[in-house]
A protein has these predicted regions:
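Outer-membrane beta-barrel proteins
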Residues: 108-112, 226-228, 276-278, 348-350, ...
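Amphipathic hydrophobic-ligand
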Residues: 66-68, 94-108, 179-191, 210-225, ...
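Short extracytoplasmic
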Residues: 57-84
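Solvent-exposed beta-strand/coil patches in large extracellular/periplasmic or lumenal scaffold regions
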Residues: 144-179, 196, 203-207, 271-278, ...
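Extended terminal
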Residues: 1-25, 236, 347-349, 407-411, ...
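Outer-membrane beta-barrel architecture
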Residues: 118-120, 162-164, 236-240, 281-285, ...
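Secondary-structure transition motifs
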Residues: 2-13, 65-66, 82, 86-195, ...
C-alpha cells in the first residue's frame, strides 16, 4: 500500500519563503558591507587628502559650526583604517578660531560611515574654556549656547551618536559668572565616552589645583528614552553618576554646586552616587571620611562643628516628601562627644488628597547626649529643639521604630517602640504649670502612642526626679524595677506604676503608685 505524501501547509510555505527572503537580505547586507569595506580601504584611504573639503563641510553640518582641518593623513592597517587630522579648528561667527585641537585620530568603519560618524574619535591635548555667563548661557571656547537649547543641539546629537570618544591630556577651565565663582582650572583631563543606541557610558578624570585636593574621577551610566535613540539631550536621560574624590576640600565645592547646606570647612575623602531621572538628581548616597567639618544645615541654625565624621549617608526625593538614611555613621563633636556609629532611616511623605502626611523612622545605636548637644544645629523643627533643650536626654537608643501621621509640627497620630539603656531625662514643665518627673541610670523598653503607653523600667545606681513630691526632688536609687503605664488626655497626664521593687541607702520595698498632673486649666 502506497501512503499519500503530506503536502506542505500554507503556513509552512510562508515560513519557508520568509526564511529564504531573510537569508537573501542577510547576504545582500554582507555584500554591501564588503563593497563598502573595499571602497573604504581601496579608494577613500589612499585619496583621503582629496576629501578634506567634504570632511570639513560634513563636520560643519554635524556640529553646526565652521570647521577647518590643517592636515589629514590615513593608514590602512587591519580591518578598520585610521585617519589622523592635525590642527582642527572650530570657528566662531566672526570666523575666528574658537577651539583648536592639535591632533585628532578617527577610526571609521562601513557601519559608522552610514551614519556619518566614526567607530572611535581620539582627541589629544585639547585646551578648552567653558564659561557660564551672567544670563545663564553657556560659552564653550567662545561659542555661546543656551542652557535650554538641548532639544535641537546638532553638535550634542552627533557627539553622543559616535561609537567611542576618547580625550587624553586635556586642559579645562570653568568660569561661572552666574554664581560669581572663581575660575576652576583642571589639568590632565581624560575622557572616555561610549555610546549605543540608547546607552551612554562615560568616564571623566582630572587633576584639580593642589588646594582643591587630589585627582578625581566621575563615572556615568545613562540611558535615553525608548523613542529617543541616540538622543544628545542629557535632560532626557536617566541613570546613575558616580564621583570618587580621594582627597578634597569640600568647602570649595560650594562655589560651583548647590550642596543644600553651607559648608565653610571640611577635608577628606568622598565617594558619592547620584540617581538621575530625566536629567534631574532624585537621590544619592555618599561615603564620607572627613575632618575639620564646619557646616550650617539650615537658616537660623548654628554651625555644626565636627572634628571628624565617617560613614554612609543617603537620601532621595519622594512625592511631597523625602527619605534620609545613615549607615555606620560615626562622628565626634567639638565638645568631645562621640556618635557610636548607628544606623538611621527616616521617611516622610506629604499630604496627598485626603491622605495625611505620614512618616516612618527606624534607628539603632543613637547617642541621646550627642543628639542633644548638636540638636540645635540640625533641622529638626521647633518642637524637637524645645524638647531636647528641656529634657537634656542622655543614654543610648539600642533600637527604635516610630510611625506617625500628620505634619511633623502637629502630629495627629504616632506609635513608638524602642529600647534605651543609660537613660537620663531632666524634669520638664508641661502646660498649665505642671511638671513631668525625670530619671537617671535607667534601662527602658517602651511602647507608646499619642494616647498613652507602657514601659518596663529598670534603674541601677540612678534616681528619680519628682518635683513637688518630696522636699528634695531627687530620689537616689540603688535598684528599681517597675512596669509603668500612662495615659495622655490633652494637657493632662496620668501614670500608674505596678510591680515596683526598689532599694537605696535608706529603704527597700515593693509598692504600687500612681501620679497625675493637676486638673487646673
Amino acid at each position: 500500500m502506497i501512503e499519500p505524501l503530506n503536502r506542505p501547509t500554507r503556513l509552512l510555505r510562508f515560513v519557508a519563503g520568509l526564511a529564504r527572503w531573510s537569508l537573501g537580505c542577510l547576504l545582500a547586507l554582507w555584500l554591501l558591507l564588503a563593497v563598502a569595506w573595499g571602497a573604504l580601504h581601496g579608494w577613500i584611504v589612499p585619496r583621503i587628502g582629496e576629501f578634506r573639503p567634504q570632511l570639513e563641510a560634513q563636520a560643519a553640518r554635524a556640529l553646526g559650526l565652521p570647521v577647518r582641518i590643517g592636515a589629514i593623513s590615513a593608514r590602512s592597517e587591519g580591518l578598520i583604517p585610521t585617519i589622523e587630522l592635525l590642527d582642527v579648528a572650530l570657528l566662531d561667527a566672526q570666523g575666528r578660531v574658537a577651539l583648536l585641537l592639535p591632533r585628532v585620530v578617527v577610526a571609521p568603519s562601513p557601519r559608522s560611515l552610514l551614519n556619518w560618524g566614526f567607530e572611535q574619535l581620539y582627541i589629544e591635548h585639547p585646551d578648552l574654556d567653558i564659561r557660564r555667563q551672567a544670563d545663564g548661557r553657556i560659552a564653550v571656547a567662545g561659542l555661546t549656547f543656551s542652557e535650554t537649547a538641548g532639544e535641537n543641539n546638532a553638535a550634542a546629537d552627533w557627539l553622543f551618536s559616535q561609537g567611542e570618544v576618547v580625550v587624553k591630556g586635556g586642559r579645562l577651565r570653568w568660569t561661572d559668572e552666574l554664581r560669581g565663582a572663581p575660575e576652576l582650572a583642571l589639568e590632565n583631563v581624560d575622557v572616555l565616552l561610549r555610546n549605543g543606541s540608547w546607552q551612554h557610558n562615560m568616564h571623566f578624570a582630572a587633576t584639580p589645583p593642589p588646594a582643591w585636593g587630589d585627582r578625581f574621577t566621575l563615572t556615568g551610566r545613562f540611558r535615553a528614552p525608548l523613542l529617543r535613540a541616540r538622543d544628545g539631550n542629557w535632560q532626557h536621560w536617566s541613570g546613575q553618576l558616580f564621583a570618587d574624590f580621594s582627597r578634597v576640600d569640600v568647602s570649595r565645592l560650594r562655589h560651583h554646586a548647590d550642596l543644600g547646606v553651607e559648608v565653610a570647612q571640611g577635608r577628606g575623602a568622598v565617594r558619592a552616587w547620584a540617581d538621575v531621572q530625566r536629567g534631574q538628581i532624585v537621590g544619592g548616597t555618599a561615603d564620607l571620611a572627613l575632618t575639620e567639618v564646619n557646616a550650617t544645615l539650615g537658616p537660623q541654625l548654628k554651625a555644626l562643628v565636627l572634628p571628624s565624621i565617617q560613614g554612609r549617608m543617603g537620601g532621595r526625593r519622594l512625592a511631597g516628601g523625602f527619605e534620609f538614611y545613615t549607615q555606620g555613621l560615626q562622628f565626634q563633636t567639638d565638645d568631645g562627644l562621640v556618635w557610636p556609629g548607628g544606623n538611621l532611616r527616616l521617611q516622610h511623605t506629604g499630604a496627598a488628597g485626603k491622605a495625611p502626611a505620614q512618616g516612618d523612622l527606624r534607628a539603632d545605636r543613637l547617642d541621646l547626649a550627642a543628639l542633644a548637644q548638636i540638636g540645635s544645629r540640625l533641622p529638626l523643627g521647633a518642637a524637637a529643639h524645645s524638647a531636647l533643650q528641656t529634657y537634656t536626654p542622655q543614654g543610648l537608643v539600642n533600637e527604635v521604630h516610630a510611625t506617625w501621621r500628620g505634619p511633623l509640627e502637629t502630629l495627629q497620630q504616632y506609635q513608638v517602640r524602642g529600647k534605651v539603656t543609660g537613660l537620663a531625662l531632666a524634669a520638664g514643665a508641661r502646660e498649665a504649670g505642671n511638671t513631668l518627673p525625670g530619671l537617671s541610670g535607667a534601662s527602658v523598653d517602651v511602647e507608646m502612642t499619642q494616647a498613652g503607653g507602657k514601659a518596663s523600667l529598670a534603674i541601677a545606681s540612678g534616681g528619680l526626679v519628682l518635683p513637688g513630691v518630696f522636699e528634695e526632688p531627687v530620689l537616689p536609687l540603688d535598684q528599681l524595677s517597675a512596669e509603668v503605664r500612662w495615659q495622655v488626655d490633652g494637657p493632662r497626664l496620668a501614670v500608674q506604676a505596678s510591680n515596683v521593687r526598689f532599694s537605696n541607702a535608706d529603704a527597700q520595698g515593693e509598692l504600687r503608685a500612681s501620679w497625675r498632673t493637676s486638673d487646673a486649666g
